A protein has these predicted regions:
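Structural preference for beta-strand elements that scaffold enzyme active sites
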Residues: 16-19, 64-67, 116-122, 152-157, ...
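Acidic (Asp/Glu)-rich catalytic clusters
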Residues: 52-61, 95-116, 136-153, 171-182, ...
Length: 267
């Protein structure tokens, strides 16, 4: 009687990854970074999509990414007065527009193939300036972004981790958050307990309470949280992202990882 041998094959499942928090910028615009320092290589060198995709070729497969603003230079007062203080952030939105439509300037390090990877992006916004100014800014941001990139705006960010106490609790800030909720846009919140202390966490909790107070559930702003919590010699970083939401994907992606505590950290 002949024997048969059945070979078993192991199929490695694919786990497509969406990188929910990346920062990139072209060399031609590093001078607009608010944290630019000629002695800091991170702010003087270009960080392009060509470099990013080259570094993400190994499994699991990269399905796409969400781009977050890189803290371009801005001024709230002149922005509120005539929009001139928004030049840096709007320049960044125009760069993302070029990524979305596959029209890079020479040397920017991206091409048409990168457009499909852009799942969403989170520009800067002048939250402390209040709802009326925020409405003007969002309209201008969408105008600069154009149709293709504009539909990929998933939320906005205003860095509070280096701001004085009370910033998150200002009337204008809270009204700006409520506007984002009405517009179905998220707010990206960076809390730096590592450098700032416990008060940032406490103020963030109060901020969420005020932003949701008296607001229907359907219009409550969704908060995307990135936290930096101190550990000896290491920094615990946890991000909870709800930027990329589709019918066939869970509503939250979470990230938890350890980094050696840096002496300087970019946004």
């Amino acid at each position: 009687m002949a024997s048969t041998t059945t070979e078993s094959t192991t199929v490695t499942p694919k786990y497509p990854i969406i990188d929910s928090h990346i920062h990139l910028y072209p060399a031609s615009e590093v001078h607009t970074l608010a944290w630019f320092d000629p002695d800091l290589p991170l702010s003087t060198n270009q960080h392009s999509l060509d470099e990013y995709t080259a570094a993400t070729t190994s499994p699991p497969e990269l399905e796409g990414f969400v781009f977050l603003e890189t803290d371009r230079e801005h001024d709230l007062d002149s922005g509120e007065a005539d929009g001139s203080g928004w030049a840096g952030p709007l320049m960044e939105i125009d760069w993302i527009r070029r990524v979305a439509v596959g029209e890079p300037k020479e040397g920017e390090g991206h091409d048409e193939s990168h457009s499909k990877l852009l799942q969403g992006f989170v520009p800067w916004a002048p939250l402390p300036s209040g709802a009326a100014v925020m409405e003007r800014y969002i309209e201008k941001a969408r105008e600069v972004a154009g149709e293709e990139a504009g539909k990929r705006i998933s939320g906005f960010r205003y860095l509070v981790q280096s701001k004085p106490k009370g910033t998150m609790l200002g009337e204008g800030f809270i009204e700006g958050l409520k506007l984002l909720g009405r517009e179905k846009l998220t707010f990206d919140l960076g809390v730096d307990q590592h450098s700032g202390g416990d008060w940032q966490l406490e103020e963030a909790v109060e901020m969420v309470k005020l932003a949701h107070e008296g607001v229907d559930d359907a219009q409550k702003v969704r908060i995307v949280i990135s936290m930096y919590i101190p550990f000896p010699r290491y920094l615990l970083c946890m991000g909870i992202s709800a930027h990329v939401l589709t019918s066939n994907r869970p509503p939250l992606q979470t990230r938890l990882f350890l980094l050696r505590s840096p002496t300087r950290r970019a946004p």
